[in-house]
Amino acid sequence: MTTNYIFVTGGVVSSLGKGIAAASLAAILEARGLNVTIMKLDPYINVDPGTMSPTQHGEVFVTEDGAETDLDLGHYERFIRTKMTRRNNFTTGRIYSEVLRKERRGDYLGATIQVIPHITNAIKERIIEGGEGHDVVLVEIGGTVGDIESLPFLEAIRQMAVDVGREHTLYMHLTLVPYLAAAGEVKTKPTQHSVKELLSIGIQPDVLICRSDRAVPANERAKIALFCNVPEKAVISLKDVDSIYKIPGLLKSQGLDDYICKRFSLTCPEANLAEWEQVLYEESNPGGEVTIGMIGKYVELPDAYKSVIEALKHGGLKNRLTVNIKLIDSQDVETRGEEMLKGLDAILIPGGFGYRGVEGKVLAARYAREHNIPYLGICLGMQVALMEFARNVAGMENANSTEFVPDCKYPVVALITEWRDEDGNVEVRTEESDLGGTMRVGGQQCHLTEGSLVRQMYGEPTIVERHRHRYEVNNMLLKQIEAAGLRVAGRSADNKLVEIIELPNHPWFVACQFHPEFTSTPRDGHPLFAGFVKAAGEYQKRQVK
């Protein structure tokens, strides 16, 4: 099988939407029956985004095989059926660390290590490895053309045309075409200069995607084609839209997929976008709306919760409801109390690390429990729900997590190495013991309890969901909590770790240790989010009555 490569770069400014554009094009090519995947190459020096601040970088997207990756991989999985893996994302930091490790081992036989060829060769090897077995691989280069950090990546993709053949490579450049109100027209000069910058590196773009707040007129597209040496039919206008799921249709309507298939000499049927048309129909024809409060600590940057926000919208699609998401700082809940939570149809507490704002989340979980408001807790959201229930229902005063209070009397959440039984004996771990409690990352099996609400929603006894956490429910204190009325609705494959809890005497109170948002898609949704949004709609109806 010959793999074809589409390299996606951005110019003029950052945040133009390269990831969405690449994912949308991939969706069209997939709809034509092609086997497609997408890669993201990040120029920053961090080895991966796992330890980066969510308020700077946005969320960390976790793949099925346990890689901590860029949030763009979430967009990729929401647009195409191919599951991302650790092969689909790498950084400058990872490339340099691998090259330096080889140098220390003597693999280069004493050669002087340089950006060209050693770093660029390592990048190319990764790209080829990630594209194995696919008809088309789209490779998004992070950052903007002209950034110092991205130069090795741009040089590597320039060399790819030589290595695999120009007939199997295509360069797609996203650029800004701003509209100047004073002049009453769009301006093409920034695009011309961006392409000039790309040409200076040795890359002639084959396709230009022109981002603007309005459709770029045909005469301006012709001008861009002339000055940038690109066929007019390969200059694509991509205007701002109210739904990202309209973009596949926009690109297809301008013949981008036909142009690419001809360029690669691919024979395949026309794209059938019926599934995307159904998504748009559901989105534009809601039967009502609900307001869901998300209580978090990184709310100043919504991208920190990108997958959760999208999953809530998907839940709305499955229920024909518009979901209005109210982002609430958990510290504000601590200081201002329940007034921050009034008027909500449901409450969601997502994952997070660190003590800041935790007591606000505990208060929100209590408010949802006591007022019969639908509640969904994810990761830390499950842990604070457990802490709240232990304190206020199970009689465990000041119950906490050892992440926040290491010497608390009732550590209902702890590392496995900190679990103590009634006699004070520490849980013993061996090399064969479960790895939970260090950092569980990636897809894990979960057995659902017969008769539970979540078993009913999933419709199957065993599921696989993705984790990213260190702390677990403390089994040593679980009996007392269960006796007070809490149900364990899901356990790990070996039945040792609590994965899901729910309250049988509450209309809809579910919390999970895993991250269901990472497997939600607009076409399929996710059982937990669909059930949660449905419960929000039912709560709203009860309040009206």
Curated annotation (Swiss-Prot):
Mg(2+) binds at D72, E140. PROSITE patterns: GATASE_TYPE_1. It catalyses: UTP + L-glutamine + ATP + H2O = CTP + L-glutamate + ADP + phosphate + 2 H(+); L-glutamine + H2O = L-glutamate + NH4(+); UTP + NH4(+) + ATP = CTP + ADP + phosphate + 2 H(+). ATP binds at S15, L16, G17, K18, G19, I20, D72, K239, D240, V241. Residues 1-266 are annotated as: Amidoligase domain. Its EC number is 6.3.4.2. Allosterically activated by GTP, when glutamine is the substrate; GTP has no effect on the reaction when ammonia is the substrate. The allosteric effector GTP functions by stabilizing the protein conformation that binds the tetrahedral intermediate(s) formed during glutamine hydrolysis. Inhibited by the product CTP, via allosteric rather than competitive inhibition. CDD domains: CTPS_N, GATase1_CTP_Synthase. It is an enzyme of class 6 (ligase). It comes from the Bacteria. Pathway: Pyrimidine metabolism; CTP biosynthesis via de novo pathway; CTP from UDP: step 2/2. GO terms for biological process: 'de novo' CTP biosynthetic process; pyrimidine nucleobase biosynthetic process. SUPFAM superfamilies: Class I glutamine amidotransferase-like (SSF52317), P-loop containing nucleoside triphosphate hydrolases (SSF52540). NCBIfam families: PRK05380.1, PyrG. Belongs to the CTP synthase family. CTPSs have evolved a hybrid strategy for distinguishing between UTP and CTP. The overlapping regions of the product feedback inhibitory and substrate sites recognize a common feature in both compounds, the triphosphate moiety. To differentiate isosteric substrate and product pyrimidine rings, an additional pocket far from the expected kinase/ligase catalytic site, specifically recognizes the cytosine and ribose portions of the product inhibitor. This is CTP synthase. It comes from Yersinia enterocolitica serotype O:8 / biotype 1B (strain NCTC 13174 / 8081).
